[in-house]
Amino acid sequence: VAVDWRLSKAFAAFANFRREDKEGTGYAGVGNFTTALQIPEPLDSTIDSYELGVQWNGKSAFARLSYFVQEYDDELNGLTWDNPYVPFNGATTGRMATAPDNEMEQILLSAGAHFAYDTSIGFNAIFGKLSQDDALLPFTTNAGVSPGALPRASLNGDADVNHFGLTLATHPLDKIRVRGSASYDERKDNTRSITFADGYVESDMFSFPDSITPERYDYERLRGEIEGEYRLYDNVRLFVGARGEELKRTEQDVDKTTEGTG
């Protein structure tokens, strides 16, 4: 469903709503330690998307601002199956979590302008937030190896995901064109650390008593490229360009990588 309101010659407001329902049966790959199998997976989920915004269109420029929300609702919190192989250590069944209910919120801004010499500049920014608070499944279906109660009922996941982009294109002379772009992406995990102090279970068969805290990670990525074109003749053009990328990560074996071509 989409609705548009013309507020004036240059300004307009809009609202969009979309629902996607998925029901039926798919397939899932699961495992019991050293063995693997494919089993039917019931599907029963809904994705609702909402967007509200305003836009402005001028003689040689435009701007658009909107608020976007996407909600994922999975009626199934987990998938349980009978072990078709000879059970080991009491593991007659297995279980794994399905995709958790989650929500994504974004503020989106885009703008652009045209100037002399066939020059145009574009900018876009996305401020995003991801969250989920689905209940955690118990450690295992095998009571004989369970280390006890979970440290908390839900992960309460919370992450910020932002993006900024800039583009430039110009045709200053009849034979020369230049194009360039730059972007910055970042992911920041704000989820409170969760520690399984009494250990964990592997494949519903083995209990490991050591305390474990899953690592969280953040990253920042900066990318840029520029390309120039010179027309020697109608069918002969020379191109020159360069591109580069820098990626910084936390809690990884390699915390920074840099790539460049030209």
Question: Which residue stretches match the model-derived regions?
Answer:
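Post-signal-peptide, soluble extracytosolic/periplasmic N-terminal scaffold domains
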Residues: 1-58, 62, 66-70, 111
